[in-house]
Amino acid sequence: MTKTFLQFLIDMKVTEVEYIVQWCEEHRSYEQKYKEQMCFHMCELFGVGHINCGLMENYSVEYTAQKLKELCQRAGKYIIGVEPMPYSGIPNLQKGWEVVKASGCENAMLILDTWHWVRANQPYDILTPEIAEKVISIQINDAYERPYADSILRDESMHDRLAPGTGAKDTAGFVKMIKDAGIDPKVVGVEVISDEILGRGINEAAAYTYENTEKVLKEAWPELVD
């Protein structure tokens, strides 16, 4: 490693930790328990306050809320950010909110992502003040007009998302919804998972994503980039 690269690592700020999954299982594997503890350790190491979590398995709201409560108790001082994903056991804002609310935990919150939002066919006018208070962070990107088939929707999520503002789903509108709801996200993440963009090379992919993200934020929420 060069001195320049080492200095870059020292100066780099880690803002989020992920990804805890399978937290609803009655008998969690050693690997999942270890991964969970590693996430807690990474929060301590890097000074991060919340952990992104997903759930692929589909259970009732009541059961999921109980398991979320148990996870939040294990997390202690750290916030558990539940991320609704359309192909998961928490497919949309409605179920995500119901689970978080029913858990009764102060450190149970929501993470909202542009791609997951639009692929769940949700309009930009359904955030209530009560739900808004439980949003810890957001992730922005964009999507094509037509989604992949439901059976392979996760493939689109993992390989073919678009940079903010470069697709058909109005990333700026998503950001404005967050702003207008009075949400103060701890993190505004840029989650562009794209084989095509990454195939251009890391430098070009980073520059392209940064430039388009900046355009969206300057349009929708200029205070974030001032």
Task: Give each language-model segment a name.
Residues 1-5, 35, 173-174:
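Alpha-helical scaffolding within the catalytic cores
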Residues 8-110, 119, 201-208, 212, ...:
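Active-site acidic/histidine proton-transfer and metal-coordination neighborhood
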Residues 21, 86, 116, 142-145, ...:
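Short, glycine/acidic-enriched loop or turn micro-motifs at the edges of active sites
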Residues 30, 93-94, 118-185, 199-204:
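Gly/Pro-rich active-site loop or hairpin
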Residues 43, 80, 113, 138, ...:
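Conserved, mostly hydrophobic/aromatic
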Residues 54, 141, 191:
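Conserved residues at the C-terminal ends of beta-strands
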Residues 186-198:
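Short helix/strand-capping connector loops at secondary-structure junctions
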Residues 191, 222-226:
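Short, flexible loop/turn segments with low-complexity composition
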